[in-house]
Amino acid sequence: MTDVFEQCKLVSDLLNRGEEVEVRNILIILLQRLKDDNIKYTPLVNHLIRETGLYPYIDVSTSDWQERFLLEAFKVDVGGNQKVTLHREQSNVLKALLNGEDLAISAPTSFGKSFIIDAFIAMKKPDNVVIIVPTIALADETRRRLYHKFSGEYNIITTIGVELAPKNLFVFPQERALNYVDSIEYIDILIADEFYKAGKIQGRQIKSEDRRIGLLIEAISLLGKKATQRYFLAPNITELKENPFTQGMQFKKVDFNTVYTDIEYTYKSFSGNQDKELEKCGHLERILTTETGKTLIYVNSHKSIHRVNTKILELDFNHPSSILTSFAFWLKESYGEDYMLAKLVQRGIGVHNGRLHRSLSQIQIRLFEKEDGLNCLVSTSSLIEGVNTSARNVVIWSNKNSTAKYDYFTYKNIVGRSGRMFKHFVGKVFVLEEPPEETSPSLELDYPETLLERIDPTEYSGKLTDEQIAKIKQHEREMDSFLGRGEYRKLVKELVSQGVSNVYLSIIINEMHKNPSKWRRTMKGLLETNPNRWKSFFRSYYASVKKSASLQRATWNNCAFYPSSI
C-alpha cells in the first residue's frame, strides 16, 4: 500500500507540473496493478482519476460525493436503456456535435468513438444518419450494435434497395452508400469512419485499391452536400491538409489515451548469430506460453500465416474449450479432416485474412471476443483495417504489408490494437522486426477521376480550376456525340456506383463507335447457351480495351485518368 501511495504522490507532482500525458500513463499502469492484485481504489486514487479526466475508471464503492456527482454529470444515454459515463474528451466531442459543429477527429483506437455516435443518436434523435465504414465486416458489427439499441425507433439499412422509413440509420461501405445518393432527401449527420482511407498520408496513397478510394471520396462529397452536419473519424493523423471535402469542418487531434501501451522491442535482443526466423519463433513461443490474456499476431502475407501456424502447431499449446471443440468438429466435417484451421482452433488459435470466407472470419472474431473462445488470432492487415477488435497482447511478426515495408502510420494502427478500455488498462506489444522511423502523418484529400466524371462541374466552380472544368465538359460533349445529348452523364451516374471505371467506359464507347459491326457480333455472343463459348467472343474485345487503356492514359491537371482494374 505504501508503494501505491508513492505512485500517487508521483502522479500528483507531475500533474502540478502540467505533464498530463505522463500522468495518465503512470496512473493507468497503477490501475492495472490494482486490478491484477484485486485491490480497491483508495480515495486518493479516485481523486487522481478525476483530475486526469478518466471519469469512467472511478470506483463508485470508494468514491466521495463529489466523484459520485461527477459520474452522474458525465453519464449519458447511449440507447437501449443504457447509460454510460464518458471520459472528459468524449464529453467535449459529444458536446460539440450536439451544438451542431462539423468535426474531423483524429483520436487513438481506445478513444471510445462508438459511445459518442450512440449518445448523439439517443439524445439528438435525428431522422437520417448515414455512417460510412470501410468494410462490410465493420458494417455488420456496427449494425448489430445499433440494432440492439435503436431498432424499435429506426429502420436500420445496410443493403441496397430498401424502402426508407421516416427515421433511418444507414450503415454501409462507400459502394453501397452511393446507391442512396438520389433516394435520401436530406441527412441530419454524415459520419465517415476511417476517412483517412479516402486520401494520401504524406503524399503516399493509403491503399492500392484506387477505385475504392475514389468511391469513398465520391460518397463523402455527394452525401455531404445533403448533410446538415458532418463527423469524420481517423486515428493517428497530426494534420489535415486544406481540401474542398472538409471545408467548414474543425479538425481536432485528440491525444487522450485510456490505455497504456507497453512496447517490447524484441528484435533488439536478437544475437545475429542465429537464423532470424528461428529467433522469432523462439520469442513467439515465449510470449504465447507466458503472457496472459488474448493475443493478436500480425503477419504480412498468407505465406507468413502458414509459417507461424506451423510453428504454433509444434508447441505444447492447448486451450481446452467445449465451444472450440464443437467449432473444430464442424470445420473438419465441412472442409476435411486435414483442414489446418480445424487443428488450430482446437489449440485456441484463429486465422484472419482476406481469402477466408466472410462467415468464417466473423465466427472467429466473435469467438476471440468470448472468454472461453479463441485465445490467439493470426492475422494479415485484413483484421487491422476492417474490424474493431483488440487484445491485451499484440505480436508484430513483420514490418511489411505484403512485400513492401509499411509506414509509421500503419505501424501505429497495429500497435493501437493492444489494450481495451474497461478490460485491459495496459496493452503489451512485442515488436519482432525493426519498426519504421517515427513521423507526424498528415492527410491529403483530392478529387479522383470517378468524382470528376460524375459531378456537375458548374456546382464545383469554386473548387475546380477553369481548365479542369473545361476539360470535363469537353470530354462529356465528345461522349454525347456518340450516345446522344445528356446520355453519357446518365450512363456514368448509373454505372459508377457499381464500381465501373469511367476510363474503361469511355474506351468502350469509343471502341463501339469505331467498330460497330464487331461489337454487334460480340453482343450476340451473349445469347449463346454455352458459357464456354463466351470467352471466344470477348477475347478480342478484352485485348482491344486493354491496348486502348495503355495508350489512352490521360492526365487532367493533377487528376490522373487511368484504369485501376477491369
Language model features: what each stretch is:
Residues 1-566:
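N-terminal helicase ATP-binding lobe
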